[in-house]
Amino acid sequence: MEMRNTTPDFILLGLFNHTRAHQVLFMMVLSIVLTSLFGNSLMILLIHWDHRLHTPMYFLLSQLSLMDMMLVSTTVPKMAADYLTGSKAISRAGCGVQIFFLPTLGGGECFLLAAMAYDRYAAVCHPLRYPTLMSWQLCLRMTMSCWLLGAADGLLQAVVTLSFPYCGAHEIDHFFCETPVLVRLACADTSVFENAMYICCVLMLLVPFSLILSSYGLILAAVLHMRSTEARKKAFATCSSHVAVVGLFYGAAIFTYMRPKSHRSTNHDKVVSAFYTMFTPLLNPLIYSVKNSEVKGALKRWLGTCVNIKHQQNEAHRSR
């Protein structure tokens, strides 16, 4: 009789090997990840430090930065530690943690981007009613809903995925535990779960995406009816950053989770997963800081404050 689950750990084959080219690539990825963590941390700091950014729009942006930081922290530290130490094992509990947080953060970000699109719709199409249409109470409810819906999906995936038997097939050809990759190793019929997961992914991607498209369709119609060129420019400026982030996130997510099995390959999965877990979190703060004058203004004021504090400390030190 075949023994099941005799090995408690899984083996992550990783993203890199120890060739010279991959060592350079690893250092580049590590630099990108550290820059991503710094950029998102700075975005959160600026939003909470500058009272001019204490609006629902920037609160939602701070939640996006928090999700991106957590997404990077869920996968990269383990990948880097495995590469540096040569140990590729990950426990079932560790695998479960990654399986839980990835859908939690990815799914939460789907809904959060829809909430941000509604915020822009209210600001552009109904500026006089914006405080009512996007009250702080509604903003907090929407934020909590994004986290809870993502967490419900993550918990379901983690529990069901780890409940399958793995009869000695413990090598995961990936750099983190991801449900679609892991269920391929199960020595049980996973077709029902895979179909249910596919439907769930389609709903979690397409429902928010449809809301985003509807919001921007209404925004575009409102902008085209604006007589003032300056008002049009301001409306496009306030929405362009969000549109760019939506395009990056949904492009990678749809390519990853909505492709037929016949078009899947391990190498493609790794590349796309690296894009949305490492590169997208880097690009988000860059997009918002480059395109948003209010964020750039907050950064200048914060740097000015830091310089003044340093100058005062030096003056106090000299006077002693």
UniProtKB/Swiss-Prot annotation:
<feature type="transmembrane region" description="Helical; Name=6">
    <location>
        <begin position="235"/>
        <end position="257"/>
    </location>
</feature>
<keyword id="KW-1133">Transmembrane helix</keyword>
<feature type="transmembrane region" description="Helical; Name=7">
    <location>
        <begin position="271"/>
        <end position="290"/>
    </location>
</feature>
<feature type="topological domain" description="Extracellular">
    <location>
        <begin position="157"/>
        <end position="193"/>
    </location>
</feature>
<keyword id="KW-0552">Olfaction</keyword>
<comment type="function">
    <text>Odorant receptor.</text>
</comment>
<feature type="glycosylation site" description="N-linked (GlcNAc...) asparagine">
    <location>
        <position position="17"/>
    </location>
</feature>
<dbReference type="InterPro" id="IPR000276">
    <property type="entry name" value="GPCR_Rhodpsn"/>
</dbReference>
<feature type="transmembrane region" description="Helical; Name=4">
    <location>
        <begin position="138"/>
        <end position="156"/>
    </location>
</feature>
<feature type="transmembrane region" description="Helical; Name=2">
    <location>
        <begin position="56"/>
        <end position="77"/>
    </location>
</feature>
<keyword id="KW-0716">Sensory transduction</keyword>
<dbReference type="InterPro" id="IPR017452">
    <property type="entry name" value="GPCR_Rhodpsn_7TM"/>
</dbReference>
<feature type="topological domain" description="Extracellular">
    <location>
        <begin position="258"/>
        <end position="270"/>
    </location>
</feature>
<feature type="topological domain" description="Cytoplasmic">
    <location>
        <begin position="48"/>
        <end position="55"/>
    </location>
</feature>
<feature type="topological domain" description="Cytoplasmic">
    <location>
        <begin position="291"/>
        <end position="320"/>
    </location>
</feature>
<feature type="topological domain" description="Cytoplasmic">
    <location>
        <begin position="119"/>
        <end position="137"/>
    </location>
</feature>
<keyword id="KW-0297">G-protein coupled receptor</keyword>
<protein>
    <recommendedName>
        <fullName>Olfactory receptor 2T33</fullName>
    </recommendedName>
</protein>
<dbReference type="GO" id="GO:0005886">
    <property type="term" value="C:plasma membrane"/>
</dbReference>
<feature type="disulfide bond">
    <location>
        <begin position="95"/>
        <end position="187"/>
    </location>
</feature>
<keyword id="KW-1015">Disulfide bond</keyword>
<keyword id="KW-0807">Transducer</keyword>
<dbReference type="GO" id="GO:0004984">
    <property type="term" value="F:olfactory receptor activity"/>
</dbReference>
<feature type="transmembrane region" description="Helical; Name=3">
    <location>
        <begin position="99"/>
        <end position="118"/>
    </location>
</feature>
<keyword id="KW-0472">Membrane</keyword>
<feature type="topological domain" description="Extracellular">
    <location>
        <begin position="78"/>
        <end position="98"/>
    </location>
</feature>
<dbReference type="Pfam" id="PF13853">
    <property type="entry name" value="7tm_4"/>
</dbReference>
<dbReference type="GO" id="GO:0004930">
    <property type="term" value="F:G protein-coupled receptor activity"/>
</dbReference>
<keyword id="KW-0812">Transmembrane</keyword>
<dbReference type="GO" id="GO:0050911">
    <property type="term" value="P:detection of chemical stimulus involved in sensory perception of smell"/>
</dbReference>
<feature type="transmembrane region" description="Helical; Name=5">
    <location>
        <begin position="194"/>
        <end position="217"/>
    </location>
</feature>
<feature type="topological domain" description="Cytoplasmic">
    <location>
        <begin position="218"/>
        <end position="234"/>
    </location>
</feature>
<comment type="similarity">
    <text>Belongs to the G-protein coupled receptor 1 family.</text>
</comment>
<feature type="topological domain" description="Extracellular">
    <location>
        <begin position="1"/>
        <end position="23"/>
    </location>
</feature>
<dbReference type="InterPro" id="IPR000725">
    <property type="entry name" value="Olfact_rcpt"/>
</dbReference>
<keyword id="KW-0675">Receptor</keyword>
<keyword id="KW-0325">Glycoprotein</keyword>
<keyword id="KW-1003">Cell membrane</keyword>
<feature type="transmembrane region" description="Helical; Name=1">
    <location>
        <begin position="24"/>
        <end position="47"/>
    </location>
</feature>
